[in-house]
Amino acid sequence: MEKLLHEALQNGCKLHKSVEFIQSRDDNACFGSYIAVAQNDIAPDQLLISCPFEYAITYNKAKEELKKLNPNFESCNPHITLCTFLALESLKGIQSKWYGYIEYLPKTFNTPLYFNENDNAFLISTNAYSAAQERLHIWKHEYQEALSLHPSPTERFTFDLYIWSATVFSSRCFSSNLIYKDSESTPILLPLIDSLNHKPKQPILWNSDFQDEKSVQLISQELVAKGNQLFNNYGPKGNEELLMGYGFCLPDNPFDTVTLKVAIHPDLPHKDQKAAILENDCQFQLSNLVFFLPKSPDKEIFQKILQCLAVVTASSLELRKLTAHLLTGDLASYVPSLRGQIKSLEVLLMYIDSRADLLLKSNPQVSPTSERQVWAKIYRDSQINILQDSITYVKNYMEESLQKTYKPLPNLLQYLILNSISIFLLQHPLFAPLSHAIESLYGSTDAEALVATDEQDILMILICVYCLSISEKLPFSISMLVEGYPAVANPEGVEVFEILDEMFFQQFTNVFGESKHFNKENVSWALQLVNDESLDFSGFTFIIAHN
């Protein structure tokens, strides 16, 4: 620390007279072994530390220096340029302008790229684990590009050194907008200023003096009592970002989140149309649907997620309704159908539940034995807690938001049974002829018994066609389903018709023989309903009659 202080002050840095860097006694210090402590009370609005622009490590300086080796560094990725520059500066030793600063920097880190196999056991199945693998791949590619640009790279310019340099930037960098007001933001290093530890919500002012001092300044915003540590505030960062970038976590981080990525099937119906709606209305890309579940469940955030999922899961009929609505309104004012609401909530629950289940199943059954494992466990445990809290919240939200639909019935399942096409219709007197035929083949018309046969889909197609044959007598209207989907024969529908013809139509002519409805066109129609409109709820398939 003495070398850094001497070098920093020589290069124009300023340090409040009551600030002293002392050896930390905290075994779990977020950064190195020194902390800044107030030797006397420090009033608000006092300059704590400053770093001149000239002493900062910036992209412009790195680029100009590396262009001496190869002019092609002019157009090189700024991250590669910065990491290569710092790595090469570290090899200069005492000849470097930043020798004292580089000597002070940690020689190793607690970020996931420094984890060994035992450490990684605490990260398995987390987003940070896969993010670390991706980062390693990117940095390998960057290192290879740096080697190709260097005319005569020394053997000491290793990939490990590049990782070290890149981690210095991820753990200590500031934005270049502090120095260059009107340029595109790139990372910069501010020696001495970056020595303060992070504390969420810490009032601190970052000031840039472009006139007199030409320096970046950290200014106190509240009294710092004698003996207290001075902190910086990196902003509202969750534990995943802290672990990946800085190598530590906060046990009760108010800004912690879980990143939830929704995978879209490549054969999603109406994919292009849905992508356009999401991009135009919500600025979401269908190919990269990423949501952040907060530590404290937030209704507004979940509503935004559900709006997006209502588009993703929309049936053909719902998509037409949504498209018409968007001619005069926006997605926020759109009220999905009951099917759309349930489907969105079910999909969200499925994703959250599967993430939580994955983390719980891969949870190490041993206690952490290293600092890295401690941070990883804090991160992992917090992810599990957020997911479990989100599951509870979504279930309660689902109950509250749908309750007005099914009241005065006791629950949603009963409402669906009474207002949907499902195998529960086999208990209705109107379906007695069909029930006898199904019971002859399957030995039962009990809903749970039929689900257990794994032939619920084929039975649903049959029930849909039967509903068409008695549509005027049904306890609910299926007119929107009839109007919304054309009864046109298609190859898949013809194939299903042949199966039903052999299983039912030919064997039970007393039920199906006299009706004109049991044909290839209507089976194709029913297949569309099952593929596009069906909803799985409590293990049963329902096709809700739209209203």
Swiss-Prot record:
Residue ranges occupied by any SET domain in the UniProt entry: 17-235
Protein name according to UniProt: Ribosomal lysine N-methyltransferase set10
Location, primary (coarse class): cytoplasm
Record's keyword annotation contains Nuclease: no
Assigned EC number: 2.1.1.-
Gene3D superfamilies, per the entry: Rubisco LSMT, substrate-binding domain (3.90.1420.10), set domain protein methyltransferase, domain 1 (3.90.1410.10)
Function: S-adenosyl-L-methionine-dependent protein-lysine N-methyltransferase that methylates ribosomal protein L23 (rpl23a and rpl23b).
Keyword set, alphabetical order: Cytoplasm, Methyltransferase, Nucleus, S-adenosyl-L-methionine, Transferase
Residues bound to S-adenosyl-L-methionine: 234
GO molecular function, one term: protein-lysine N-methyltransferase activity
This protein's GO CC annotations: cytosol; nucleus
Domain of life, source organism: Eukaryota
Subcellular location: Cytoplasm; Nucleus
EC class name: transferase
GO term, biological process aspect, one: ribosome biogenesis
Record family assignment: Belongs to the class V-like SAM-binding methyltransferase superfamily. RKM1 family.
